[in-house]
Amino acid sequence: MIRFTIFPRLLVLPGQKSNPYIQDFVSSLEQTGEAVVVNPPHKNPLFSLLPMKRWGDVFVFNWYENVPDYKYGPIQTVFALLLVLGAKMCGRKIVWVLHNKGPHRQEHVKQKRFLTRFIARHSDLILTHAREGIDLARRYDRRAEAKTCFLHHPTKNRLPKSRPTGPVMYDLLIWGQISRYKGVIEYVRYLRNNPCKGLRVCIVGACPSQSLAEEITRELTDTITFINRSPSFEELARYVEQSAFVLEPYKPESVLSSGTLMDSLSFGAKVIGPDTGSFKDYAQEKRLNVYTFRDYREIDEIVTRYRDCPVSWEGYRDFLEENSWPNFGRRVVELVKKC
């Protein structure tokens, strides 16, 4: 039985929402029957790893480079460095999951850059959910390419039992938490300045930044709907059914892979995203309807050209089952055995 420590395993209180990636990761490992996760959820997921009873044979670090953004960031940054060095000295394996090209928050840039290069150098295995991540890891450390492995971002099959037959209300659906790096305000401004496009757009997702929400609201036109709240997966399924495409207007500078992309595919959506990372990978995947853009004008062209292009339910189902969370857990365990 392989013992894993997964970071960050944050304690989620009742009524709170969090990124489900970590809990799904934990479950996928334990479902293999060959692994157990030894660190419980905690309100401080880094300092909670101080007791060695919470040290597994393998440490898996996600978003390690974001530690400087934490409360008491300088102290936690030093602890993060010492934790990796201590784990290596004790013969533990280090796995780093490379999620992004760079941190989305542009603060503590030097510390984050140092942590990124540090974890790339000291990892025994680097996992990335986009093929571009292999080249990126090599730029962080010239020896990293040999230990970097591409694994599809795991997902779930949420395809409806029957194909949607209702009317399409929106050309484009933008969903998920609204943050600066996702490029929503820039795209809304583009639409406002190009009213002849006439695209019907629905934006649904909680916007934690009141100033950003107000900026978006000021730029709305008659063809753009903004719903400032987080939808349930049941509601999201209906929005996807009512939309011709899901659009992710992310800024390409930081995005590498996207959970929103995978969740959209899990509902059978046609997806438009920037020509980078996993979007670029899946634009070449014949089973999927994923399209990429380099500038906003290309989004208009994609909508016009592919609006009536059918989705292969069989192709989507095959892709989703192939890249399920249980399969992901098995692949991770096998890779850890070899490193």
What residues fall within each predicted segment?
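Nucleotide-sugar-dependent
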Residues: 248-262, 276, 280-281
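Nucleotide-activated donor-binding/catalytic signature segment of Leloir-type glycosyltransferases, i.e.
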Residues: 213-234, 245
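Donor nucleotide-sugar binding/catalytic pocket of nucleotide-sugar-dependent glycosyltransferases
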Residues: 121-159
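A charged, aromatic-enriched C-terminal amphipathic alpha-helix characteristic of glycosyltransferases
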Residues: 294-301, 307-339
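Conserved donor-binding/catalytic core segment of Leloir-type glycosyltransferases
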Residues: 165-183, 188-192, 201-204
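Acidic donor-binding loop of glycosyltransferase active sites
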Residues: 240-255, 269
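Glycosyltransferase donor-sugar binding loop
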Residues: 200-214, 229
